[in-house]
Amino acid sequence: LGNQKRMNYALRPDMTQVEFIQEVTDGLMPPPPYFPINVKLNKEGGYADIDEVLNQGLRSLSPAEFEAAADEVSALVLDVRSPEEFAVGHVPNSIFIGLDGNFAPWVGELIVDVQQPILLVVSEGREEEAVTRLARVGFDRTLGFLKGGTEAWINAGMSTETVNSISAEQFEAEHSSNQDRIFDVRKQGEHRSEHLEGAHHTPLSALNDHLAEFPAVEPFYLHCAGGYRSMIASSMLKARGIHNMVDVQGGFTAISETKIPRTSYVCPSTL
């Protein structure tokens, strides 16, 4: 406790209550839209029975059934595989939020309506995990998953889309002529701590508020910290008709190993 009093920026003895509140809340994002809804459900009840949720969500759908279900109820196609798999090929207009990342927080942040019908593209063997993790944050209207995944989708003659994804080394080679078309989708604190010189800061959580800022024709580059959030951003932009993005694999972590100019590092705790 004594060490905390000496070192913790928010425990200075000369701080007023107003200053303390400012320190500990600076940079905090608003709570995800599902938070107040889940609070209400926790207080009043109303969660769907988990067995019913699983029975519905674990329906395996052929490509034709999957497409028909999506059209019938305007279901959101949610791809929960890896960023690399999504980049290689995905169902058009699907949104990527991978299970191997901050899945539940980003689902709650980006899918506003907990009553949104959802169809899953998921790796074999992880179907129940996906349905369960969605239900835990209030999204209990999963209607099923694509049987056989994208391979079955392609074999059925359905079209797929891809994301142009390049290595940090390739990005370094292209950087000098594209410095004004780089978009950093990390959080404010990450960006303020260190970023690429000249990069636009467009947090993933606020992406929909910045659609007009992305070039209409020329390629532009997206990066986050490690490649997870930038692929989410790519999927969201593609679903809104913007397809000229280039995703940087490995994000800022990989870019930091190149010679691309960056701002001086500032410890986040001092911001």
Identify the role of each PLM range:
Residues G2-G46, D51-N55, E72-S74, P83-L271:
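Rhodanese-like catalytic fold shared by cysteine-dependent sulfurtransferases
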